């Protein structure tokens, strides 16, 4: 393939397909030098004025700012800062109406000017050759310089991405759209500064060739630039035929080199980089004068504007303020355009501010503006395809855009559309094709943005899963190493498992016995265990619990005041004596007394005490009644008869209780199971109450 420089050096100019020659209407505004617009009282500076994301705010409400002071700062070359257009106070930071047909609002910094227009401290650069290209790119970025030809792509990022790749640097001065003359007047009035800005770009990029391309309808601009070069041959000025849209990047590259930029790639892929003349001027001001991009040249034209021309307008100035000072009278019948008649946008609210994208304010009257005709059905005439300079098929893209068939729209290369407006200009059905294409692009971009977010989330999830897997593998590896270390320790200890030995010592400590530290686990005392519902092995504390209950019941019996207590004490003494006699055997067997047997013995003692108390009380009552009856052999007294009946019932009850007690005692002896301590305590209390009642009854009878 022929090299781009070879084709350029041939001196030939190529002609692209399509294109038109609309009425230029440039003479309305290019006859007078650029003037300076009046300072407004209030400025509304949008925080995002470029193709990219907005930066982070550096100011807040109530702050005083100086002219050129940064209001935002990004975290990369693609996030451009914005600057204060004049000195004043930040009144608010809130959404403000944007210069867009949608009429939507965007975040803006509202600055109330103090009228002093005082600059922040500046550090001009006298010799930029003493700085590295990277340092100059940083200065361009911090000045907020973006492409002023319409795309507003961050200049610093664009230049940085093309380092070492550029063979041909093209400075675009074609300005092909009707009515717009801001670049024409800039080249006439500031040719020397534009040349200096081009040389700065050449120093950074180091291309082999530099060319300034201008349409042949701007002879004054061509002469001004050639005069400023003063015979220097470090750059060329090449005049090209006037044809719309020869100022578009891909079309201008084809005109100069005959080469097309591949689909989906940038011009740097073929060794070409393009910048606008206004961008070159802004680069010079940023590097040499240390002035950020806070103003730009705006063309004020249209028959509704009496004082036409080009003005330096501060960014953030309300559009209605500018139009008011050039004699514009609002008229609802005719809209105001930001941009030219081919690619411009209608502004629904004139309070919207000027931004870096605004190169023209067009206010036509009834001689220049036709009311929008009624849209009709497409007749498949192919006029749009014939006029398209990018070799697209607008009629097909129109159908797919209306059907929201995004896949087909991409297949027909909708994203290659430069939105020049030619298809809508030549359409006999008056179909606003560019509006359909812009809406379809926005939908596709939104879908792609969501897909990117989803993919990023997927990548984060997979990275997290991989991290968790690595951690799990590391944990398993640590466990395996620990197990291997335990096996080695077990082998070193001659078969004694250190874990089992530690568990044995812990169990021995809980049982109140000192573990043998130096011995093996087999030498530790045997500890009874039971199984829980979950299958875990825990120590069996039932014997200790029964022993504690027996001791508590014994203390309760000892502290009692009834005869039962005395009997219980005597029986307890008997049991203690028996236990004392059995002590040698216990010592011989080296076994502690069985708590279950102790509990059974206590229960038997309580039963015997209860029986003795009932027997004694019954005999005393019987003897007293018999004696009184023998001494007084008279007719039976009803009271005595009742007493006798009660005595009989008491004897019968006593006999029954004695029989039940003996049976229970025998069963208890046969089945050595510890009685329920609560029931035993209740029974003992009832027995004491009955014995006390019987004793009181016997005393009353004696009296």
From Swiss-Prot:
Keyword annotations of the record: 4Fe-4S, Cell inner membrane, Cell membrane, Electron transport, Iron, Iron-sulfur, Membrane, Metal-binding, Repeat, Translocase, Transport
Pfam families referenced in this protein's UniProt entry, alphabetically: Complex1_51K (PF01512), Fer4_7 (PF12838), RnfC_N (PF13375)
Annotated cofactor note: Binds 2 [4Fe-4S] clusters per subunit.
Composition bias, Low complexity: 559-577, 598-629, 641-669
GO biological process per UniProt: electron transport chain
Gene Ontology, cellular component aspect: plasma membrane
Domain (4Fe-4S ferredoxin-type): residue spans on this chain: 369-398, 408-437
Ranges of biased composition (kind: Polar residues): 578-592
Membrane topology recorded in Swiss-Prot or TrEMBL: Peripheral membrane protein
Region Disordered: start-end pairs: 467-542, 555-680
Subunit comment: The complex is composed of six subunits: RnfA, RnfB, RnfC, RnfD, RnfE and RnfG.
HAMAP family: RsxC_RnfC
Protein name: Ion-translocating oxidoreductase complex subunit C
Species for this entry: Actinobacillus succinogenes (strain ATCC 55618 / DSM 22257 / CCUG 43843 / 130Z)
């Amino acid at each position: 393939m022929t090299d781009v420089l070879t084709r350029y050096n041939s001196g030939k100019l190529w002609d692209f397909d399509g294109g038109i020659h609309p009425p230029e209407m440039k003479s309305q505004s290019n006859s007078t030098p650029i003037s300076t617009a009046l300072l407004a009282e209030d400025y509304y500076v949008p925080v995002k004025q470029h193709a990219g994301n907005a930066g982070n705010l550096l100011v807040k409400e109530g702050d005083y700012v100086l002219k050129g002071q940064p209001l935002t700062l990004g975290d990369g070359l693609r996030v451009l800062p914005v600057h204060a257009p004049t000195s004043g106070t930040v009144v608010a930071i809130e959404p403000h109406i944007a210069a867009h047909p949608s009429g939507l609002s965007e975040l803006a910094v509202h600055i109330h000017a103090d009228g002093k227009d005082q600059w922040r401290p500046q550090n001009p650069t006298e010799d930029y050759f003493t700085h590295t290209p990277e340092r100059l790119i940083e200065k361009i970025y911090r000045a907020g310089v973006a492409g002023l030809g319409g795309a507003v792509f961050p200049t610093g990022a664009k230049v940085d991405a093309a380092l070492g790749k550029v063979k041909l640097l093209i400075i675009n001065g074609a300005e092909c759209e009707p009515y717009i003359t801001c670049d024409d007047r800039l080249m006439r009035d500031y040719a020397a500064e534009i040349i200096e800005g081009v040389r700065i770009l050449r120093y950074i990029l180091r291309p082999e060739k530099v060319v300034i391309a201008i349409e042949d309808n701007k002879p004054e601009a061509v002469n001004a630039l050639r005069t400023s070069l003063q015979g220097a041959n470090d750059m060329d000025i090449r005049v090209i035929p006037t044809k719309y849209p020869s100022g578009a990047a891909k079309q201008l590259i084809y005109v100069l080199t005959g080469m097309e930029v591949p689909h989906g790639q940038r011009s740097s892929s073929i060794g070409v980089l393009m910048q606008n003349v206004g961008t070159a001027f802004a680069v010079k001001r940023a590097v040499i004068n240390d002035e950020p991009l806070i103003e730009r040249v705006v063309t004020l034209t249209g028959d509704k504007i009496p004082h036409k021309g080009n003005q330096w307008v501060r960014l953030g100035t309300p559009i209605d303020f500018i139009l008011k000072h050039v004699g514009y009278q609002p008229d609802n019948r005719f809209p105001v355009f930001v941009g030219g008649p081919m690619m411009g946008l209608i502004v629904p609210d004139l309070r919207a501010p000027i931004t870096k994208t605004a190169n023209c304010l067009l206010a036509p009257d009834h001689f220049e503006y036709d009311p929008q005709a009624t849209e009709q059905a497409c007749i498949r005439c192919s006029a749009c395809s014939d006029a398209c300079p990018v070799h697209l098929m607008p009629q097909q893209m129109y159908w797919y855009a209306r059907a929201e068939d995004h896949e087909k729209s991409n297949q027909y290369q909708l994203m290659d559309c430069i939105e020049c407006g030619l298809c809508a200009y030549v359409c006999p059905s008056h179909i606003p094709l560019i509006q359909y294409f812009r809406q379809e692009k926005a939908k596709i971009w939104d879908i792609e943005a969501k897909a990117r977010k989803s993919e990023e989330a997927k990548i984060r999830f997979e990275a997290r899963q991989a991290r968790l897997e690595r951690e799990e593998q590391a944990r398993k590896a640590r466990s395996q190493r620990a197990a291997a270390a335990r096996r080695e320790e077990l082998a070193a200890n001659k078969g004694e498992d250190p874990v089992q030995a530690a568990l044995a010592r812990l169990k021995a400590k809980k049982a109140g016995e000192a573990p043998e530290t130096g011995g093996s686990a087999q030498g530790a005392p045997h500890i009874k265990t039971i199984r829980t519902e979950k299958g875990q092995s825990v120590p069996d504390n039932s014997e200790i619990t029964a022993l504690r209950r027996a001791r508590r019941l014994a203390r309760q019996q000892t502290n009692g005041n009834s005869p039962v207590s005395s009997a219980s004490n005597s029986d307890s003494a008997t049991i203690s004596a028996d236990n004392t006699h059995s002590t040698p055997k216990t010592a011989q067997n080296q076994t502690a007394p069985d708590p279950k047997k102790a509990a059974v013995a206590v229960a038997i003692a309580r039963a015997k005490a209860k029986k003795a108390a009932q027997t004694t009380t019954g005999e005393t009552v019987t003897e007293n009644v018999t004696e009184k009856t023998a001494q007084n052999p008279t007719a039976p007294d009803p009271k005595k008869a009742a007493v006798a009946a009660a005595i009989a019932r008491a004897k019968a009850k006593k006999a029954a209780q004695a029989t039940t007690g003996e049976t229970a005692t025998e069963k208890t002896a046969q089945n050595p199971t510890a009685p329920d301590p609560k029931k035993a305590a209740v029974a003992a209390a009832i027995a004491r109450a009955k014995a006390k009642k019987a004793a009181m009854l016997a005393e009353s009878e004696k009296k």
